[in-house]
Amino acid sequence: MAVQQNKKTPSKRGMRRAHDVLKKPTFSVDFSSGETHRRHHVTPDGYYRGKKVIFSKDENEEENE
């Protein structure tokens, strides 16, 4: 089993942990509905880049009639 020869200093420990931070997700505003959503993700209403991409059952029935 590997054993360290010398104790790591708090400075070196901090330098190692410098890259462990988590970034906050980036949000955008949809220009058709004005809704906030994550970048490159579909809005909760089913819009992506101004176009409806996910249709609910009710919307499918309305289009068929």
From Swiss-Prot:
Tell me the keywords, alphabetical order. Answer: Ribonucleoprotein, Ribosomal protein
Q: Name one GO biological process term.
A: translation
An example GO CC term for this entry is: large ribosomal subunit
Return the annotated region ranges for Disordered.
Answer: 1-45
Q: Name one GO molecular function term.
A: structural constituent of ribosome
Q: Which Pfam families match?
A: Ribosomal_L32p
Q: Does the keyword Repeat apply?
A: no
Q: Which SUPFAM superfamilies match?
A: Zn-binding ribosomal proteins
HAMAP family attached to this UniProt entry: Ribosomal_bL32
So what family is this one in? Belongs to the bacterial ribosomal protein bL32 family.
Protein's name in the database: Large ribosomal subunit protein bL32
Source organism per entry reads Nitrosococcus oceani (strain ATCC 19707 / BCRC 17464 / JCM 30415 / NCIMB 11848 / C-107)
